[in-house]
Swiss-Prot record:
The modification N6-(pyridoxal phosphate)lysine is found at K353. Residues 1-41 are lumenal. Its cofactor is pyridoxal 5'-phosphate. Its main location: endoplasmic reticulum. It is found in: Endoplasmic reticulum membrane. It is an enzyme of class 4 (lyase). It catalyses: sphinganine 1-phosphate = hexadecanal + phosphoethanolamine; sphing-4-enine 1-phosphate = (2E)-hexadecenal + phosphoethanolamine. The keyword NAD does not apply. GO terms for molecular function: pyridoxal phosphate binding; sphinganine-1-phosphate aldolase activity. It comes from the Eukaryota. This is Sphingosine-1-phosphate lyase 1. The modification Phosphoserine is found at S564.
Amino acid sequence: MPSTDLLTLKAFEPYLEILEVYSTKAKNYVNGHCTKYEPWQLIAWSVVWTLLIVWGYEFVFQPESLWSRFKKKCFKLTRKMPIIGRKIQDKLNKTKDDISKNMSFLKVDKEYVKALPSQGLSSSAVLEKLKEYSSMDAFWQEGRASGTVYSGEEKLTELLVKAYGDFAWSNPLHPDIFPGLRKIEAEIVRIACSLFNGGPDSCGCVTSGGTESILMACKAYRDLAFEKGIKTSEIVAPQSAHAAFNKAASYFGMKIVRVPLTKMMEVDVRAMRRAISRNTAMLVCSTPQFPHGVIDPVPEVAKLAVKYKIPLHVDACLGGFLTVFMEKAGYPLEHPFDFRVKGVTSISADTHKYGYAPKGSSLVLYSDKKYRNYQFFVDTDWQGGIYASPTIAGSRPGGISAACWAALMHFGENGYVEATKQIIKTARFLKSELENIKGIFVFGNPQLSVIALGSRDFDIYRLSNLMTAKGWNLNQLQFPPSIHFCITLLHARKRVAIQFLKDIRESVTQIMKNPKAKTTGMGAIYGMAQTTVDRNMVAELSSVFLDSLYSTDTVTQGSQMNGSPKPH
């Protein structure tokens, strides 16, 4: 009796014969068509078409999509058209002037120092001059700024200043000269690994801030992906993930794939699964994300990371040093978020936020040293010797690390738990009260310290303008239009939260008398920027702000900034 395999093969024989006939015809057609060409011509055409195909592939498949590049080209050509381009530029220049006029930090009534003094000043004279500069600072001591300063307590400040002073000349680049500083940084990393439930192989690095921590994780995963044969690595991140991931993509030649959010402002896990490709180098979650203070579903995304064998980075820069103390503070989170979750391979956390260290202090942590090794940079052939650097910077200020260590030791576990308790209690109180104010709503279900507000009745930027007029400083957000307030220890004081609610209620009541009125000032500029289709134009407007940071011209002298060739 014939076998099943033999019967199956015989069943396909007619189809194989047909295929052979057509393949023979195709071969004869091609051979006949090529007889009129000489061999060198066939080779030349093959080379030309191969190059064209390779060029076409590289042109289409770039980190920036073809559609995005097409739009940029169209907008660029439009701005070069004689009449339309001139009108666009005039409007752009007017907007730049409006932005400059609304920059409060440029309104300085004292002359800028533009050259070294001929004779050096005494210590007392220098300190007296510095008092003039510190007196320009805004109202942060009163607790009216969103985030920005996370403690500001006088005794803590004295401790941090003393710790910095003792290590002012130290540099982690030279551990042989400053072994005590090396010990300090190693202890900071180990303490953080323990707080985030890292195992014995967990490790990390001290960085200059959250952006550098994120950059380092992205660099590590890019190099890991490259080793696997992925030439253009993709970062799959929620729409709400920090802009530092875009910066990493720009710096390191990666592509960022943004994933939409659910109505609760969490990442859509199913959409994230669809976004994963053979070029995906890393997945991203936030705990919490900056815009709305919402925590992404880390365990669900971690399952994708494990299934597809992709590293998962959890960005805890903003709330990391709250999340690790939430349970002991009496506010347990619904889901784990750290190295306890299988699939989480790295975490970024800022010690200079709720770790209460001075600015310029953050951490990037890894579940295993094998990931951190890809972060390192080593040049074995430099004439100056073998150069090895763990992070972006070479030399770093040891005083910052010493002050960070001092803050950790000063607060201790009990101190951090108590601080977390005060902040979350204040945040939960504000959230419950804000949800009951007619005309505004709270985005998602923020569980930590950030509360984002929106409105279906009026332009929310009007509320930001009115609160600014009352002395508050809120963060303006976009897509969708919203504002947020980040609660710190300064806001946990008795009357700050009450005054904030009072001013919000008064402002909303005033707006609701004429809800359709147009926004003015910076709110209008921000709203306009959000609706502008040409994002390059928005970037150009943003450069006005960046230029202004280094302006040494008084407001009355015009709007020309340092580094600008001429006034616009």
